[in-house]
Amino acid sequence: MLYKGDTLYLDWLEDGIAELVFDAPGSVNKLDTATVASLGEAIGVLEQQSDLKGLLLRSNKAAFIVGADITEFLSLFLVPEEQLSQWLQFANSVFNRLEDLPVPTIAAVNGYALGGGCECVLATDYRLATPDLRIGLPETKLGIMPGFGGSVRMPRMLGADSALEIIAAGKDVGADQALKIGLVDGVVKAEKLVEGAKAVLRQAINGDLDWKAKRQPKLEPLKLSKIEATMSFTIAKGMVAQTAGKHYPAPITAVKTIEAAARFGREEALNLENKSFVPLAHTNEARALVGIFLNDQYVKGKAKKLTKDVETPKQAAVLGAGIMGGGIAYQSAWKGVPVVMKDINDKSLTLGMTEAAKLLNKQLERGKIDGLKLAGVISTIHPTLDYAGFDRVDVVVEAVVENPKVKKAVLAETEQKVRPDTVLASNTSTIPISELANALERPENFCGMHFFNPVHRMPLVEIIRGEKSSDETIAKVVAWASKMGKTPIVVNDCPGFFVNRVLFPYFAGFSQLLRDGADFRKIDKVMEKQFGWPMGPAYLLDVVGIDTAHHAQAVMAAGFPQRMQKDYRDAIDALFDANRFGQKNGLGFWRYKEDSKGKPKKEEDAVVDDLLAEVSQPKRDFSEEEIIARMMIPMVNEVVRCLEESIIATPAEADMALIYGLGFPPFHGGAFRWLDTLGSAKYLDMAQQYQHLGPLYEVPEGLRNKARHNEPYYPPVEPARPVGDLKTA
């Protein structure tokens, strides 16, 4: 053994060839600060070996290196800029020394090589991979850019276009694509990986392969003519501006850095990467996006822990076909859980099956499945007008009309047709679960399971615990949602649960702005372009359905009369009374016509201004700041109340529910992350300006308390230790 660290070791393999093996104590290898320091020590040992002829890097895990340790990021981002810059210089000196070894080097890459893992293998001369490879640089998705030389080496290896596509989009690619673009030199079966890598090294040692020529381009300026450079970088900047926009500075910074570094050799190019990385790491966007990653891990870990002792349902059923029922049935069948889909009429069943078939055909068009797989999946959805097969199902989700009487009747009837241990769930969006449970003999086997539309796209499923729902019931439904590829978040019961309960105060803020003379077009523009929502409130209401929102608003007002009962006729009432239900009937805040792809395209409709004039004061202008404040304060206040009332368990779960269920702008990180970034005292000052607008604008006492003590909602993060300690960590 030449060297043994906590996460890697170095040993002789054969005849002058050494192997450096990543072997962390846990289930995966991460390139954390300690591993970078250990890698530097191992390379120091290699540099002393006079009889070294070649080096093979490999992993003892199912994946090579999954990336940097993102749990360290938030504390690293708090390190002063100069210290962070110094640490990056140290880390890059380690990879440079790996790249500069006076012998050929090869990485035998299995499974994932992402982020720092990818940057590590870019420093070797050759890369041999297994068919299960996923390799790439996802840093821009975390609000940063590659910091271990990825933005320098990858363009010089692949050419500007392929590298920009991966780096700017934060993409990873599979083995075939990696081989095609030159990111790896070969793909072999897992059992032949090490032997294959040794064979390549022997060829390089014997002079059959010119490893020095392979290495040289990575040390030099990027080989691009002026015209090629202009085209590549202009196109990349245009694409990034279109897709990422101003709220996500990392992708455009990465492109500009690669462009600026193109004319320099490795050292100067790495300096430019360093100068770009450090300011990005100190942005609110980076903290928010890293926070989302960590919250996502937390939420998924919680679901895994909850379901460790239960069996995932093997057979499911959906009550109520149509678009929603068909979407749920498709998602279940697509992920391997056969489903019975019941309705009371043929027309709805046909609609449900058509929806499932349409979604499967999209997978076929994208090349994700072949005709055989499509036929196989669709055959596991069984449409029925009766309860045939219900004695075999483990879980049933009801997705009938949003009417408590109808839902109670359907659930009570179904309870008589299933096994005593079968779990029933309701896909209601607003009706309290405990109210529906009154109709059942076994309320402990019942809970809420709120999907979001369109089911195949929206990641969130709210699992609602009723007063009598058992832990096992919740666990089974969480297991099914996870199996469907969804992110289940368990919430406690109340009208609207979590997501709709906090959405309707936001709509109330919108209605009040319109009442006071604001233009809905400007509100939408501000909330989309400035705050960052994917849709403004008017457009969102058109998509959700004005009739759906009108009904849900009444349910919420009955549930929370003190705050959500309104004493005036609003824009939603006016449009509803005029039979303008949004996209579903082509008339809402806008008029809708289908484009060439069959998608609804919005157009101005002057009639709307006349309708809104009946429920509004004369038009006047509002500043962007006032629009954002008046829209967001009611929502954030309600989010805080939900935490204080234990409707939702943690700030992390609340923020993920908002992002995955409503499209809350990820660069803000969620409502609690936004609050922490703004500061609770500053938020309180802002909210107090609008208290006269009513109870929705009154800040909850718990938040006032946070402001008094200057406390954040997320646990404070300590800066990482000084750079000298990081080196030797």
From Swiss-Prot:
Q: Where is this site: Important for catalytic activity?
A: E119, E139
> Where does this protein hold substrate?
D296, N500, Y660
InterPro entries named in the record: 3-OHacyl-CoA_DH_CS (IPR006180), 3-OHacyl-CoA_DH_NAD-bd (IPR006176), 3HC_DH_C (IPR006108), 6-PGluconate_DH-like_C_sf (IPR008927), ClpP/crotonase-like_dom_sf (IPR029045), Enoyl-CoA_hyd/isom_CS (IPR018376), Enoyl-CoA_hydra/iso (IPR001753), FA_oxidation_alpha_subunit (IPR050136)
Active site (catalytic residues): H450 (for 3-hydroxyacyl-coa dehydrogenase activity)
Q: Give the Enzyme Commission number.
A: 4.2.1.17, 5.1.2.3, 5.3.3.8, 1.1.1.35
Q: Which UniProt keywords apply?
A: Fatty acid metabolism, Isomerase, Lipid degradation, Lipid metabolism, Lyase, Multifunctional enzyme, NAD, Oxidoreductase
Q: Provide the residue span(s) of the region labelled 3-hydroxyacyl-CoA dehydrogenase.
A: 311-729
Q: Which reaction does it catalyse?
A: a (3S)-3-hydroxyacyl-CoA + NAD(+) = a 3-oxoacyl-CoA + NADH + H(+); a (3S)-3-hydroxyacyl-CoA = a (2E)-enoyl-CoA + H2O; a 4-saturated-(3S)-3-hydroxyacyl-CoA = a (3E)-enoyl-CoA + H2O; (3S)-3-hydroxybutanoyl-CoA = (3R)-3-hydroxybutanoyl-CoA
Identify the pathway.
Answer: Lipid metabolism; fatty acid beta-oxidation
Which PROSITE patterns does the record associate with it? Answer: 3HCDH (PS00067), ENOYL_COA_HYDRATASE (PS00166)
Q: What does this protein do?
A: Involved in the aerobic and anaerobic degradation of long-chain fatty acids via beta-oxidation cycle. Catalyzes the formation of 3-oxoacyl-CoA from enoyl-CoA via L-3-hydroxyacyl-CoA. It can also use D-3-hydroxyacyl-CoA and cis-3-enoyl-CoA as substrate.
Task: Name the family the entry cites.
Answer: In the N-terminal section; belongs to the enoyl-CoA hydratase/isomerase family. In the C-terminal section; belongs to the 3-hydroxyacyl-CoA dehydrogenase family.
Subunit description: Heterotetramer of two alpha chains (FadB) and two beta chains (FadA).
Q: Per its record, how is this protein called by name?
A: Fatty acid oxidation complex subunit alpha
